Amino acid sequence: MSQVVVCALYKFVSLPHFESIQKPLLALMEESGVKGTLLLASEGINGTVAGSQAAIDSLLMWLYQQPGLDNIVHKRSFDEQMPFYRTKVKLKKEIVTMGVEGIDPLKVVGTYVKPRDWNKLISDPDVLLVDTRNEYEIQIGTFKNAVDPKTDTFREFPAYVKDNLDPAKHKKVAMFCTGGIRCEKSTAYLKEQGFDEVYHLEGGVLKYLEEVKQEESLWEGECFVFDNRVAVNHNLEKGQYDQCNACRMPITETEKASEAYVQGVSCPHCIDSTSDKQRRRFEERERQMLLAAKRGEAHIGSDVSQVILSRRTEKEDQRQAQNKKA
């Protein structure tokens, strides 16, 4: 078994004094060698971290002892290498951002469905199955017959619902995401919009892959994860995908053989959408990363989750600017 334990965790809970646990939590993680990022907000905790079995056990035990943080939802997988470079505990307004005020999974949420019962539910022809993840995640794997909302960020999901779903027409809606947290808010949102029967996969895709045998699985492809593994297969092991360091899209070995692929600079997904100035910047970043790797250091530009977040923020800013002009 691989030595590094990767633990995705979250819990929606009222944490009025969440700021007070930031420093002791960060200190514990640094002391035990746990890397990754945890988000704290008044609505709860969310994040993915990695470390030794003992270190992850110690972290979870510490969290369980904090008021309201017992029974945190968590999923474990394994990797041969540490998938994160840094250790962070961030204070946020939301632990998962939908951008809609007043959506509170602690007050209303969809019906949880255990992984062992999921196949039966989504095989019902009257159930509309919706993948709440982003399009680049869906491209490498999803459930059979799932609808792709074609969103770039979770903030776009409410608009998808408004334009495409109807409580009078869609009587039963089932949703899923990577670890379950996005569905906490998406199902709460649908309930607020008047949808009656709303279901979501408890523990998300990762829990489904952990508990459902591959020969019985309705999952097709691999599951995108927000760390340096890029994706995991049905055994929750690192999958076959790499990632373009320029646009962060998952890429195959075939795509890496393309003339459009230059490590850290471009790939078939982004070659036509980046400027010469951007490519020069990517080239310099790649050069610095290679130098840092030779020195045995972690370059600041190599944290996958941070770059993905930056890319999302940049796209959101551009979209808002375009809307203002319109």
From Swiss-Prot:
Sequence segments annotated as region (Disordered): 304-326
EC number in record: 1.14.-.-
One BP term from GO: tRNA modification
GO molecular-function terms, A-Z: oxidoreductase activity, acting on paired donors, with incorporation or reduction of molecular oxygen
Reactions catalysed according to its record: uridine(34) in tRNA + AH2 + O2 = 5-hydroxyuridine(34) in tRNA + A + H2O
CDD domains: RHOD_YceA
Keywords: Oxidoreductase, tRNA processing
Segments forming domain Rhodanese: 123-217
Pfam families reported for this sequence: Rhodanese, UPF0176_N
Location of the active site: C177
Functional summary from the UniProt entry: Catalyzes oxygen-dependent 5-hydroxyuridine (ho5U) modification at position 34 in tRNAs.
Family under the similarity heading: Belongs to the TrhO family.
Protein name (record): tRNA uridine(34) hydroxylase
Gene: trhO
